[in-house]
């Protein structure tokens, strides 16, 4: 669709329903569509690609992850970052679980999704770590007959924990974050989220092949492969500081 058409479409739709949310599916830098007169937001495919690349490519260092995230959040105006449609898989991509076949890596990436600015989106089936290769396999039917299985209920419960963390902790939704680089390990990602009231959480992801001794203390809000001191390989830790 042309920019001219989108501008006229927005003007017409906003006249009918002023609070309508116009979302675009743009796979690259969408700045020219987000000038306030076309889309309100876009699907954040650059963030999806950057997260996947870091976890797929073991040669990438945490500084490259940091650069990617910062780039994604400096491409657009701040009001756009508030409502970016953040996703890890969709009807047009290979499913998240299909890329890694590893629940720990799967939840590491979901922890990122639920602690960065924007609007987290879960593709149907991701709540049970459903697999599926590239289109059309990524659009396979939801296995409703298997939903009540013990394994799937555990996965759904874990997803609910992340959703409730996002909902209950304002700092998870905050726009403010930084990377302190407090660990020497090249693939130990650490970032701090802050809100306007001074609340802080730390997100720690061990994407290396070595265990990491965690520094300091804090209230654990979400964890995998963490025993209270050591964050295991592919471990995740979100804690209040």
Q: How should these model regions be labeled?
A:
Residues 12, 19-21, 83-85, 119-122, ...:
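Beta-sheet entry/capping signal
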Residues 180-216:
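Carbohydrate-binding surface patches
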Residues 23-24, 120-124, 170-176:
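Acidic/polar loop patches that form or flank catalytic/metal-binding clefts of enzymes
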Residues 1-79, 131-161, 196, 209-210:
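Active-site-proximal helices and loops of the catalytic beta/alpha 8
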Residues 217-226:
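Solvent-exposed beta-hairpin/edge-strand motifs
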Residues 227-241:
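C-terminal beta-strand-rich structural cap/linker in extracellular carbohydrate-active enzymes
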Residues 159-173:
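Amphipathic alpha-helical
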Residues 35-41, 82, 89-103, 110-151:
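Aromatic/acidic polysaccharide-binding cleft in carbohydrate-active enzymes
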């Amino acid at each position: 669709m042309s920019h001219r058409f989108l501008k006229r479409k927005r003007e017409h739709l906003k006249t009918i329903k002023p609070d309508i949310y116009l979302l675009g599916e743009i796979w690259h830098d969408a700045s020219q569509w987000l000038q306030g007169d076309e889309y309100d937001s876009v699907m954040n495919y650059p963030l999806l690609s950057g997260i996947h690349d870091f976890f797929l490519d073991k040669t990438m260092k945490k500084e490259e992850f940091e650069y990617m995230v910062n780039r994604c959040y400096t491409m657009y105006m701040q009001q756009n970052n508030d409502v970016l449609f953040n996703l890890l898989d969709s009807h047009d991509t290979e499913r998240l679980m299909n890329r890694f076949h590893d629940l720990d890596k799967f939840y590491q990436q979901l922890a990122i999704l639920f602690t960065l600015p924007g609007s987290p989106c879960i593709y149907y089936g991701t709540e049970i770590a459903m697999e599926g290769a590239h289109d059309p396999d990524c659009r396979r039917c939801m296995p409703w007959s298997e939903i009540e299985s013990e394994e799937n209920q555990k996965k759904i419960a874990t997803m609910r924990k992340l959703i409730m963390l996002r909902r209950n902790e304002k700092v998870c939704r905050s726009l403010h974050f930084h990377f302190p680089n407090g660990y020497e390990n090249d693939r130990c990602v650490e970032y701090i989220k802050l809100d306007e009231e001074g609340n802080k959480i730390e997100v720690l992801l061990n994407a290396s092949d070595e265990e990491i001794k965690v520094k300091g203390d804090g209230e654990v809000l979400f964890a995998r492969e963490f025993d209270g001191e050591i964050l295991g390989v592919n471990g995740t830790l979100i804690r209040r500081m």
